[in-house]
Regions:
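Retroviral integrase
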Residues: 1-126, 156-181
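Short, charged, surface-exposed loops that flank catalytic or proteolytic processing sites
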Residues: 132-145
Length: 181
């Protein structure tokens, strides 16, 4: 029997307001890197392409992405992420301390402990792959439409869409919205 038994991960906070708790992750698809974040209450999804080889990569890029989120949605109480180098860098830890943000790392032994981020990555990858044109490049208008549909699609459990939870109303679009998620 190993001397270091695996202990279950620290339980995430239960958010009561939108963007009080968010889950974040990075992923790679078709030669591009993306930062994805999801509000744990509403399911609101944000996807940002990260330009490798610029100041958008690494911890500096993570902090730029988080500042954009905070300027739009407010300062979260808790951010959940994996233990990737961007999230565990000294600069990131200092940023979280300065802003009073609790950083919850998912366990390598319990990857599902950051399930909201994993679901966000899966959704973002599907949207990106579904909206690549014949030339192989991303159709940005189609991607925006996909995000609008995602944000307007009601959750089967609570019967509200991320937009309804966050804004109190659906987003204005000019196309039908699916009621299935």
């Amino acid at each position: 029997m190993p001397s270091h038994a695996r202990s279950p991960p620290i339980e995430p906070m239960i958010p009561t307001t939108p963007f009080e708790a968010i889950a974040c992750d990075y992923f790679h698809l078709n030669g591009c890197y993306y930062f994805v974040s999801a509000d744990r209450l509403s399911g609101w999804l944000e996807v940002q392409q990260i330009k490798v080889g610029t100041n958008e990569a690494g911890a500096k890029g993570l902090l730029m992405a988080l500042r954009r989120l905070m300027a739009t949605f407010g300062v979260p109480t808790e951010i959940s992420s994996d233990g990737g180098p961007e999230f565990t860098a000294h600069e990131t830890k200092t940023f979280f301390e300065r802003w009073g943000i609790r950083h919850r790392l998912s366990s390598a032994f319990f990857p599902s402990s950051n399930g909201r981020a994993e679901l966000a990555v899966k959704s973002a990858k599907r949207m990106l792959m579904d909206n690549v044109g014949q030339s192989g490049s991303l159709n940005t208008d189609a991607m925006v439409r996909a995000l609008l549909v995602h944000r307007n699609t009601p959750d089967p459990g609570c019967k509200l869409s991320p937009a309804q939870v966050l804004l109190g109303r659906p987003l204005v679009t000019h196309f039908p919205v699916s009621t299935k998620k």
